[in-house]
């Protein structure tokens, strides 16, 4: 079985920063919780005085939250953010949670690929989960497509339409 054969639905949401990719996935998650066994994680911005200083990871099942990246100097890093490799275990645990028939992956991007097991965990989710909703950093669309994702480009103008389309594709209604 190839990666493309298993998942019934692999939707990736990509777009420029600030268009609402994580917001869309979070809103879909709220509706989907009553219908699906969900696994995965959400990445949220951390702000101080209105300025983004980093990102936290939240396990969508347990609600456990850990710091993932902060401004600073150190390794590994992506741009101005230093990655907390200790949080990679939370990402792995969140993706491997069973049972799972809808995986939330927010996001597939450079920071997540700094985690030693992220590629393996992502491949396992793609192979073993019938539905996946992911946010895709715009520089990683090619990788997502190779994994069989259908990628939707999100803008502020098409946000509401895309949200409704994703719900419909998952068999959900609001």
Curated annotation (Swiss-Prot):
Keyword DNA repair: no
Organism per entry: Pyrobaculum islandicum (strain DSM 4184 / JCM 9189 / GEO3)
Entry's family note: Belongs to the THEP1 NTPase family.
Residues engaged in binding ATP: 15-22, 102-109
Protein name as annotated: Nucleoside-triphosphatase THEP1
ATP-binding as UniProt keyword: yes
Catalytic reaction equation(s): a ribonucleoside 5'-triphosphate + H2O = a ribonucleoside 5'-diphosphate + phosphate + H(+)
Domain of life per record: Archaea
E.C. no: 3.6.1.15
GO molecular function: ATP binding; ribonucleoside triphosphate phosphatase activity
InterPro entries cross-referenced by the UniProt entry: Nuc-triphosphatase_THEP1, P-loop_NTPase
Function: Has nucleotide phosphatase activity towards ATP, GTP, CTP, TTP and UTP. May hydrolyze nucleoside diphosphates with lower efficiency.
Keywords (A to Z) from UniProt: ATP-binding, Hydrolase, Nucleotide-binding
């Amino acid at each position: 079985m190839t990666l493309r054969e298993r998942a019934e639905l692999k939707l990736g949401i990509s777009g420029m920063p600030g268009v609402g990719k994580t917001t869309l996935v979070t809103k879909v998650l709220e509706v989907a919780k009553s219908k699906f066994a969900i696994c995965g994680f959400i990445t949220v911005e951390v702000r101080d005085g209105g300025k983004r200083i980093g990102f936290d990871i939240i396990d969508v099942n347990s609600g456990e939250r850990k710091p993932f990246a902060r401004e600073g100097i150190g390794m590994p890093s992506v741009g101005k953010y230093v990655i907390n490799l200790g949080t990679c275990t939370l990402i792995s645990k969140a993706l491997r949670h069973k049972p799972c028939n809808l995986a939330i992956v927010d996001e597939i991007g450079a920071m997540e690929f700094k985690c030693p097991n992220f590629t393996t965990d992502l491949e396992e989710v793609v192979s073993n989960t019938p539905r996946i909703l992911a946010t895709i950093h715009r520089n990683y669309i090619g990788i997502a497509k190779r994994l069989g994702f259908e990628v939707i480009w999100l803008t502020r103008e098409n946000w509401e339409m895309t949200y409704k389309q994703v719900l419909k594709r998952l068999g959900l209604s609001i």
